[in-house]
Amino acid sequence: MSTLITLKNVAVNFGDRRVLNNISLHLQRGNILTLLGPNGAGKSTLVRVVLGLIEPSSGTIEQTDGLKIGYVPQKLHLDPTLPLTVKRFMMLKPGVKSGDILPALERVNAAHLLQQPMQKLSGGESQRVLLARALLNQPQLLVLDEPTQGVDVNGQLALYDLINQIRTELHCAVLMVSHDLHLVMAKTDEVLCLNQHICCSGTPEVVSTHPEFIAMFGHHGAEQLAIYRHQHDHHQHNHHHDLKGKIILENNRECHS
């Protein structure tokens, strides 16, 4: 398994305030790493360090030459008076060819949105368009900052399934910031709990029993994490979710529970 980015003892200061301290991690192809932590923990700052938007105050970053990164921001802020269709929005990405747009939207089951105004999209539709845009350059690393913010629970299930499928197809690394403990954990390979420093890291099973994780999210959060992961691995392997969140069994029948 090849390592795409390595952070070693990275720290970030904003003036006199230390936002990140002694961060070391590896992003590897085919792996999903999920960042968890309270508000103000430095999660978005760490994402910007990985994207190369913030220079660390100390420590080192090593990355593969020519690394292609796709980024899905937490939220897109558009001028409501600016007429902008999904197609025109996708064309704003440098180097994009018109013929690349529809296949990317089809990949995330959003081709029907091609001529829709960006401002009229629902939360789930907007996130799928942002994901399609991030896939235009066939990224080796996909970075998602709270990808399901503003999306209902059913839409969240569908988005996480989709991200997992993309990881498998592209064999890309995925770095994801999330608060959705019980939803995201069924798909992630590694969890990193952040609160300016790395409190704990490892598989969901390991992290869910760690004292610092329990201190951060409480016993209920830890139980939720461990139980969901166990149930999903052992009892929910015979289905996936469509983009409306409906459960689809492997024989393509809908489950109407």
Curated annotation (Swiss-Prot):
Identify which top EC class this enzyme belongs to. Answer: translocase
Q: Which GO terms fall under biological process for this protein? A: response to zinc ion
UniProt keyword Cell cycle, yes or no: no
Query: Mind telling me which Pfam families this protein's record contains?
Result: ABC_tran
The chemistry this enzyme catalyses reads: Zn(2+)(out) + ATP(in) + H2O(in) = Zn(2+)(in) + ADP(in) + phosphate(in) + H(+)(in)
Q: What is the membrane topology noted in the UniProt record heading this document?
A: Peripheral membrane protein
- Specify which residues bind ATP according to the UniProt entry for this protein: 37-44
Q: Which GO terms describe its cellular component?
A: plasma membrane
Where does the protein end up? Cell inner membrane
Regarding protein family, the annotation reads:
Belongs to the ABC transporter superfamily. Zinc importer (TC 3.A.1.15.5) family.
Oligomeric state and partners? The complex is composed of two ATP-binding proteins (ZnuC), two transmembrane proteins (ZnuB) and a solute-binding protein (ZnuA).
- What does this protein do, in the record's words? Part of the ABC transporter complex ZnuABC involved in zinc import. Responsible for energy coupling to the transport system.
What is the protein's given name? Zinc import ATP-binding protein ZnuC
Native species of this protein? Answer: Photorhabdus laumondii subsp. laumondii (strain DSM 15139 / CIP 105565 / TT01) (Photorhabdus luminescens subsp. laumondii)
Give the organism's phylogenetic lineage. Answer: Bacteria, Pseudomonadati, Pseudomonadota, Gammaproteobacteria, Enterobacterales
Give the gene that encodes this protein: znuC
